[in-house]
C-alpha cells in the first residue's frame, strides 16, 4: 500500500496466509511490526513491534479463550494480565500481575472483578490499582435493570491516593435513568438524573452536584435535543446549564450539531461513510443588548480520506497503519513530510476519468449548507466567505485564525 505522502507499506505473510510482518519505506526502511506468531488454531501467540516491545498470548486448551497476555519492553514486564471466565465465557476477572514500576514511572498492578445476574447482565464491578510512589486507587460499580432489560441505575465510587496529586481524591456519580411512557417510545431515554461529586474531603451530600439530562427525539427516533439543567445548593434550578441540538438528514445521518453555540457540520459519501467534519467557534458582541458585531470561524476541519488517512487544517494529516482490523501505528505529518501542499491543485482536478466537475459550484453549495445549519440552530453566522477558489485557495479557509494556520 502506497500512502499519499509516498510511504510504501509492505505486508508479509506466512505459508498459511497469516500476516507476520509490516514494513514501511520512505527514504529509509522501518519495520512497524517485526514479527507475528500463531499457533495451530491460527490464534495470535506473539507480536513484536519495531520498538522492541513484545506481546505473548496464551489460551486455555479446552475453549481457546485468552488466558494470559504479557507485554515485555526494555527488559521489564509492563503488563501480565490473567483472565478468568464463567461457563458462558463472561469475563469474571482481569488481574495484571506485573511488578510495581520504579519511582516516577507509569504503570502498576491492577485487578478487576465482574459479577453478573441470572440473565448475564453486569451488576457489579470492582477494581484496584497499585503504582509507584504509593499510588493507589479503587472503585466499585453497581448497575440496575428493569424487567425490560433497560438500565435503570448506574453508580460508581472511586478513591485515589497520590495519583493526580499528593493526597486523597474521592469521586463518584449516581445515575438514574427514566424512559418514555408512550407506546413506541419505551426504549427511548427521556431523562437521566446525575448526582456526582469530586472532593478531597470525606464525601457528603453538601459536595454533590445535581444535574438532569433531558432528551428529545424526532419521528425516526434520532436524538435532536439534549438539555442539561442543574439544581444549585440553594435549591433553585438552572434550567439551561448546557444544551445540545442535532440535525439529521433523510437517511438518518448526522448533518450538524450545536453545542452551546459551537456548531459542527458533517458530510458523507454515497456509501454513507463520513468524509468531512468542519467546526469552529462563534463570537458575538452586544452593546446595550444590541448586536454590534461578531465573528464565525469554520476553519477547523477533518477530512476522512479513508480509514488509513485523516487530513486537518494547516496541512496536518494523520495516517493509520493496521494489522487486520487492529490499528498499530498513527503517524502525524505536515507539508514538509508530504513533500508539497496538496491543496495547490487548480480546481482540485476538475477533469477526472472523462468527467467534468464544477468544483467552484460544489464549494459554494457546501458553504451554503454551513450557513443553513447555523440558521437551523438560530446561531448567528458572521463568517467571511473565501470565494477565491483558484489555485486551491478555497480549501485553505485562511481567515487569519490560529486554527487555519
PLM ranges: what are they?
Residues 1-13, 21-28, 40, 46-55, ...:
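Beta-turn initiation residues at beta-strand->coil junctions
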Residues 102-106, 132-134, 165-168, 204-206, ...:
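Short consensus segments that form the blades of beta-propeller domains
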Residues 78, 139, 144-192, 233-235, ...:
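Short secondary-structure transition motifs
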Residues 8-9, 33-34, 54-56, 80-81, ...:
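Short loop/turn microsegments at loop-to-beta-strand junctions
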Amino acid at each position: 500500500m502506497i500512502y499519499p505522502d509516498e510511504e510504501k507499506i509492505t505486508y508479509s505473510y506466512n505459508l498459511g496466509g497469516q500476516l507476520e510482518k509490516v514494513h514501511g519505506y520512505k527514504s529509509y526502511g522501518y519495520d512497524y511490526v517485526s514479527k507475528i506468531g500463531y499457533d495451530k488454531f491460527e490464534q495470535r501467540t506473539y507480536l513484536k513491534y519495531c520498538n522492541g516491545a513484545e506481546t505473548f498470548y496464551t489460551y486455555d486448551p479446552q475453549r481457546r479463550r485468552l488466558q494470559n497476555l504479557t507485554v515485555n519492553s526494555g527488559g521489564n514486564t509492563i503488563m501480565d494480565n490473567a483472565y478468568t471466565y464463567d461457563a458462558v465465557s463472561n469475563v469474571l476477572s482481569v488481574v495484571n500481575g506485573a511488578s510495581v514500576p520504579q519511582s516516577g514511572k507509569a504503570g502498576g498492578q491492577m485487578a478487576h472483578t465482574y459479577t453478573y445476574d441470572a440473565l448475564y447482565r453486569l451488576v457489579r464491578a470492582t477494581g484496584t490499582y497499585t503504582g509507584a510512589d504509593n499510588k493507589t486507587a479503587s472503585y466499585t460499580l453497581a448497575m440496575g435493570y428493569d424487567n425490560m432489560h433497560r438500565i435503570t441505575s448506574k453508580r460508581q465510587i472511586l478513591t485515589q491516593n497520590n495519583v493526580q496529586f499528593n493526597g486523597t481524591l474521592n469521586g463518584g456519580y449516581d445515575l438514574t435513568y427514566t424512559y418514555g411512557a408512550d407506546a413506541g417510545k419505551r426504549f427511548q431515554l427521556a431523562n437521566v438524573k446525575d448526582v456526582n461529586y469530586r472532593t478531597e474531603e470525606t464525601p457528603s451530600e453538601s459536595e454533590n452536584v445535581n444535574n438532569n439530562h433531558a432528551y428529545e427525539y424526532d419521528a425516526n427516533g434520532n436524538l435532536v435535543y439534549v438539555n442539561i439543567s442543574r439544581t444549585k445548593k440553594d435549591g433553585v434550578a438552572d434550567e439551561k446549564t448546557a444544551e445540545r441540538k442535532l440535525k439529521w438528514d433523510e437517511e438518518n445521518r448526522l448533518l450538524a450539531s450545536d453545542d452551546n453555540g459551537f456548531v459542527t457540520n458533517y458530510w458523507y459519501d454515497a456509501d454513507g461513510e463520513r468524509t468531512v467534519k468542519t467546526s469552529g467557534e462563534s463570537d458575538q458582541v452586544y452593546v446595550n443588548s444590541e448586536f454590534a458585531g461578531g465573528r464565525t470561524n469554520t476553519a477547523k476541519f477533518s477530512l476522512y480520506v479513508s480509514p488509513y488517512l485523516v487530513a486537518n487544517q494547516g496541512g496536518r494529516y494523520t495516517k493509520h497503519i493496521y494489522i487486520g482490523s487492529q490499528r498499530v501505528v498513527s503517524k502525524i505529518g505536515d507539508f514538509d513530510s508530504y513533500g508539497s501542499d496538496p491543496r495547490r491543485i487548480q480546481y482540485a482536478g476538475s477533469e477526472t476519468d472523462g468527467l467534468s466537475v464544477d468544483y467552484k459550484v460544489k464549494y459554494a453549495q457546501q458553504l451554503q449548507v454551513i450557513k443553513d445549519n447555523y440558521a437551523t440552530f438560530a446561531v448567528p453566522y458572521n463568517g467571511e466567505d473565501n470565494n477565491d477558489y483558484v489555485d486551491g485557495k478555497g480549501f485553505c479557509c485562511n481567515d487569519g485564525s490560529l486554527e487555519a494556520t
